[in-house]
Amino acid sequence: MKVFMTSSPMGAYRSEGPPPFRGLDPANGMVEELRRYWREHSRCLLISAFPDGHDVNDKMREDFGRIFRETGLSVECMDLCDRRNGREITSELMRYDMVILGGGHVPTQKRFFDEIGLRDAFQGWDGIVMGISAGSMNCAEVVYAQPEMPGEAADPSYPRFIRGLGLTDINVLPHYQAVKDDYVDGLRLMEEITYPDSRGRVFYAITDGSYVLETGDRKEIRGEAYRIADGQIRQVCRKGEILALK
């Protein structure tokens, strides 16, 4: 399996203007890496993080198909998985060459993954996974469900660490350039929530256009990234650079 854990591969989060490129973001060699493993006429599956947002999901499926074709990737189909067909389509996962795990709210997406049995469905599957934002976070064995919605940081019963898909042992935090100064429940997201939660753990905060790539023989950060561990943060990779994690 080849796992691309991205922040946003189609433009900057919270940006008002269109991205300065067509298709997928070519920064940090992501398109070249995708092409390295891409099969001609790939069958692609988009698994939504909003299982009941049917109209939004249908539009998203159309957008992804267009974006992949604009990138020059050969696509036979771009199918959609949401609550209308979840169990049925994951039982046929072996038909697909590439799976996209969409962005959204981490716990909501995780509950849907559990509902459709996605973790088990990935067993023995050998294709390309592209996680986007929450989809990248949920790839981990133990997911850090960083508080983001009102009430989550203040709620002592909110589960900040949950069982994920088990595709990696890396915890990715997306959109660092956009969220680093955010507040949740009156607390600074990074300094007062995330840094304390990193005690005894390691998180990698990445900016949009950056990603983590894990294959059978490689585990790399591509682009701007920051290592958060034991309450401290430091930059470990810059745009255009590669950091091997093993």
Model-derived features with residue positions:
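Portal/gating segments that form or line small-molecule/metal binding sites
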Residues: 45-108
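Short, well-ordered alpha-helix to beta-strand connector turns
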Residues: 41, 96, 125-126, 168
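C-terminal and late-domain segments of enzyme folds
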Residues: 1-40, 58, 62, 145, ...
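A residue-level signal for conserved active-site and pocket-lining positions in enzyme catalytic cores
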Residues: 44, 99, 133, 172, ...
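Catalytic nucleophile loop
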Residues: 100-102, 123-142
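Catalytic-core regions built around general acid/base machinery
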Residues: 92, 115-127
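Glycine-rich nucleotide phosphate-binding loop and flanking beta-alpha elements
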Residues: 11, 53, 106-107, 136-138, ...
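Glycine/threonine-rich flexible loop motifs
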Residues: 106-115, 182
